[in-house]
Amino acid sequence: GGGGGNVSGSYREAGGNMQPGAYGSYNYTGMDLSISRTAAPTYGGDNSFPGQESSRFRANQNCPLSTPDPLPCAKSQKSELSPADPATSSAHFTETEETSASSETDESTPRSGAPPRALQDNCSPGAAGTDGQSPQIFPWMRKLHINHDMAGPDGKRARTAYTRYQTLELEKEFHFNRYLTRRRRIEIAHTLCLSERQIKIWFQNRRMKWKKDNKLKSMSLATGSSAFQP
């Protein structure tokens, strides 16, 4: 009985000792003061922490400016400019060689053809001088001169071979006018590419034929009328 009382008394004393100590350590005013005191330095530490973070953030912002690596867009441009396939680059190189070779051949051909042009230019002033001295010659006049110079086997001038179109036009004109004026003769000569002399001779021959035909008709009519007379 006495031992149990001592144990309970010691337990109470221990409990009594623990309660004031716990109460003193966990005093409300002490807790508030301790929290406020401990919070002040921790809050100051918290105030200093954003400064460190801001300095780190600024350092991180300054890092891309100091990096020597080029921008990704420049890398992409370089990759686009660089040929992806060596076969395509070789094909492009061969095409440039072919085009350069063709341009060289094109340039060489005019150079080779240049001397004949120069010779023609040298010959042209002489021809121009001769043309300037001689009167102007039209194509139809040149053809007429050739026809006049041509001679037959007997030494006579060759007959002019009129085309069907020329003969038809001359027949039309003769049907309306048996005698031509000089102005009309020149117009017909230019139209049919003939000379005035050829037009004049053709009309003379056509009139002679017409007179001969009329004479034969008149003679036939006279003989016919005399035959019907009693």
Curated annotation (Swiss-Prot):
Species whose genome carries this gene: Xenopus laevis (African clawed frog)
Lineage: superkingdom: Eukaryota
Keyword DNA-binding attached: yes
Stated family: Belongs to the Antp homeobox family.
Chief localization: nucleus
Localization of this protein: Nucleus
Full protein name: Homeobox protein Hox-B5
Region listing for Disordered, in residue ranges: 1-135
Taxonomy of the source species: Eukaryota, Metazoa, Chordata, Craniata, Vertebrata
Gene for this chain: hoxb5
